Amino acid sequence: MQVKKTLLRRALEYKPILKSEKLNVWYGRVHALKDVDVIIPSKRITAIMGPSGCGKSTLLKAFNRLLEVEGARVEGKVYFHDVDIYSDSADPYTIRRKIGMVFQKPIPLPMSIYDNVAYGLRVNGVKDKRLLDEVVRENLEKVGLWDEVKDRLRDSAFNLSGGQQQRLCIARALAVEPEVILLDEPTSSLDPASTKRIEELLKRLSGDYTIVIVTHNVHQAMRLAEYVVFIFEGRIVEQGDAEEIFKNPRSILTKAYIKGDFS
C-alpha cells in the first residue's frame, strides 16, 4: 500500500487533465479493471502499455464514456478538469467532443474526404461554408494530409491508403477542438512508413493536445511517451515519468515486460 501511495505521489508531480479514482469495470462477470487510480498529464504523450487482455483499451474507453454498452458496468470516478464525467450532470456528448477517440483500425465515414473532417462541425450546427473550408484545410494541414488530398477533397475517403485514412481520422477528431486525443493502438495495422508518420504527427500535436496512446509495442512507447502507465491483469502496476520507468522500473513485472519476457 505504501509503495502504491509513493508512486501516485510521484505521478501527481505532473499536472493532470484526467484522473481516475477506484475505477472498476466489469463486462458481465469479468472484472476488467480493478481499483484503478491513474493520472493523465496535460499536454504530454502518455503511453498505456501492458500485455494483451490486461485492460488497456478498457481504460482508454472509460476516459470518454465509451463503456456505456449492454453488459458493461463502471464504478468509481473519472475526472476531467476535476469534473466527474460519470456524474448525472455530465453530458456525454460534450465529453466525447472534448476527449476525442481514434481507433485501432482506421474508420473513415462513408463520405468524401472533405465531409469526414467537416462532419463534427455540421453535427454541432455549423453551416458557414467559409468556416468549414478553413477548418477542413487547417486540420488536414495539421496531420500532413492537405498537400496529398487538396485536389480530390470530394473523393471518397475509402480511396485513401490505410495510413492516410488514419491521419484523416485524427484530422476529424481535431476539427471539433478537443483537449485530449485517445488512440487505441493506432498504428498496429499500418506499415512501418505510415507508422513513422503517425508517430511524428503525435509528437507535433503533443504541444497543443494531451495525447493518450494504448500500445502493446514497448519500443513505440519508448519513442513517444513522456509518461507511462503499465497495466497487468486489470491493475495499475506502475506509472510515472517514462524515462525513469524504462531505465529503472520499480516492479519486477514492469521490468520483465520491458525486456520482452512476456507480451
Q: PLM features: residue spans?
A:
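ABC ATPase NBD Q-loop/coupling interface
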Residues: K77-T94, R154, I245
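Conserved ABC ATPase "signature" region
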Residues: V83-D84, R130-K150
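Conserved ABC ATPase signature
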Residues: D155-L160, Q164
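Conserved catalytic motifs of ABC-family nucleotide-binding domains
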Residues: E177
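Catalytic Walker B motif of ABC-type/P-loop ATPase nucleotide-binding domains
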Residues: I181-D184
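ABC ATPase "signature
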Residues: Q239-G240
